[in-house]
Amino acid sequence: MTIEQIANRLTELCRQGQYETAQKELYADNATSTEPEHAPGLQSVSGKNAIIEKGHQFQSMVEAVHSSTVSDPIIAGNYFSVAAVIDLTMKGMGRMTMTEVAVYKVADGKVVSEEFFY
């Protein structure tokens, strides 16, 4: 797949809330995921299975998702980024709006890294 195809497919799946499908389909086995140092309860991990498990961990912290939007991807070289806005209720933390930018690196037709900024 080209970077354009990967970026568009990942965006499509994220808009549908199918994050795990995106990871299983588009990520390299040795992909990395980097969270900001201030991320509540989430850590940076290496490996597709660890990324999927981190997604499960995040979902276990969510009481309800009220709405979410994901921007069209912006592509530059081997990287693409998307912005997301999620209106959600976190367990024990109440309702909040989470805004983030995600930057993805692609190599050999797979996502090899993701990094989140929020």
List the predicted regions and their residue ranges:
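Short beta-strand segments enriched in hydrophobic/aromatic residues
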Residues: 27, 86-88, 102, 118
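Short, cysteine-centered beta-strand-loop-beta hairpins and adjacent loop/turn segments enriched
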Residues: 88-96
